[in-house]
A protein has these predicted regions:
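Cell-envelope and extracellular/periplasmic
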Residues: 1-295
Length: 295
């Protein structure tokens, strides 16, 4: 696994390298020493791909810039201008996207997030000249610090079916609601290993022409006579749905399975027991109406 990471600057028109890449004048190996400069989510994603295809090298071009609104990442935005536009003509295998917290801070940006996200997917695919380029993104974690987080989360879900997408194939959202291992009060919760595994499973399914894994998707809801709401899910998206009890004592893995040496290792080794089965029945779901207001 190798990576190139961009510097957080909008000066100039050339792709701005971080000092570690600038000094090396090359791709950097994803070693322990270099990992501090490299997205942990991307590391976990790459690890899963290596597990599935140990003889295929993985290269990550990292353009992440924390605390920035999505408008800076689309055409006309300051980050797009020297982080994305210079990559036009490159061949890439896909895009990983985890952003939206900044846009959750005020109502105006939250309410325009879906249209911005839809444009971003179309534009990035155009840059790399592939209208079905795999685009994988994470739905925001449930951090309660910003008032409009739920609106952005709903916008991210709605993007999947937005009619403005030039091509809806190979677009997948990874749910993070159940992955934080009890750290939902942190703006950067645990669980990137789980997210990386889920995104890799989606990408591998896309590349192999198989059904892409996703979370349950509601088709419709109706009121029952007893005052409850009955939810119906889209066919095939809620098979085997069951209640589980979160393991709040589970911490991030300190070791990584050696997939090359151990053929029995699986991509989910090291992140098992995040939740355990329970005899409890499902009690309810968090739902929102078309305006993004949550019930």
């Amino acid at each position: 696994v190798h990576f190139v990471a961009s510097a957080n600057t909008t000066e100039g028109t050339d792709f701005p390298l971080r000092d570690v890449n600038e000094q090396a004048d090359s791709w950097l190996d994803a070693t322990v020493d270099n990992s501090q400069h490299f997205s942990y989510l991307a590391q976990q994603f790459a690890m899963q791909l290596r597990a599935a295809h140990p003889n295929v090298p993985v290269g990550i071009i990292q353009t992440a810039w924390g605390g920035t609104p999505i408008r800076n990442h689309v055409k006309g935005g300051s980050i797009y201008a020297n982080h994305i536009a210079p990559l036009e003509g490159f061949h890439v295998a896909g895009v990983l996207w985890y952003q939206g917290c900044n846009d959750s801070a005020n109502e105006a940006t939250a309410l325009t997030y879906e249209s911005q996200m839809t444009s971003l997917i179309n534009q990035y695919r155009a840059v790399f000249d592939q209208n079905d380029l795999p685009f994988l993104y994470v739905q925001l974690a449930r951090w309660p610090g910003y008032q409009y987080t739920q609106n952005v989360r709903f916008a991210q879900l709605s993007t999947l079916s937005n009619v403005g997408l030039h091509n809806a194939s190979n677009v997948a959202m990874t749910v993070s609601l159940d992955t934080d291992k009890g750290t939902s009060t942190l703006i950067h919760p645990l669980g990137k290993d789980i997210l990386g595994a889920r995104m890799a499973a989606q990408y591998l399914a896309m590349s192999e022409g198989k059904a892409v894994p996703n979370g349950p998707l509601i088709a419709y809801a109706k009121h029952a006579s007893d005052g409850t709401i009955i939810l119906s899910f889209q066919k095939g998206t809620a098979t085997g749905l069951q209640a589980e009890k979160p393991n709040y004592s589970k911490t991030a893995s300190t070791t990584v399975p050696n997939y090359t040496a151990n053929s029995d290792a699986t991509p989910l080794d090291g992140i098992a027991n995040v939740a355990t089965p329970t005899s409890a029945s499902l009690q309810g779901f968090e739902i929102a109406d078309d305006s993004g207001k949550w019930a």
